[in-house]
Amino acid sequence: MEMKKLGDIVLFKVPEEMELTNAQDIKRFVYENSFDKGLKKVILDFSETKYIDSTGLGTMVALHKQALMNAGAVVFLNLDSNIKNLLKMTALDRILNIYDNEREAIEFLNK
């Protein structure tokens, strides 16, 4: 999983799929490279992600909760329309921080 630092923000590129076989590894990688290091602002870039299952949704919620517990925030960036629809159907779009461009995501995290 690709990662880059943007000041005090960490951006992670989510792979093509986020599902049962890799969701735990993704969550662990994000924790180890952000929250565990005291970094509280995280962007997950879904621009390459085309499929997510219930385990992936659970991972998104877990990362969101972990950020809140650390007085931080996670932004979910560049979601595919099918993933956005799934979040709407589950009402997670009302809870999660979802943005379509990196500049707006960074502005949100820096306010």
Place the predicted regions along the sequence by residue.
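STAS-typified acidic loop motif
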Residues: 1-28, 46
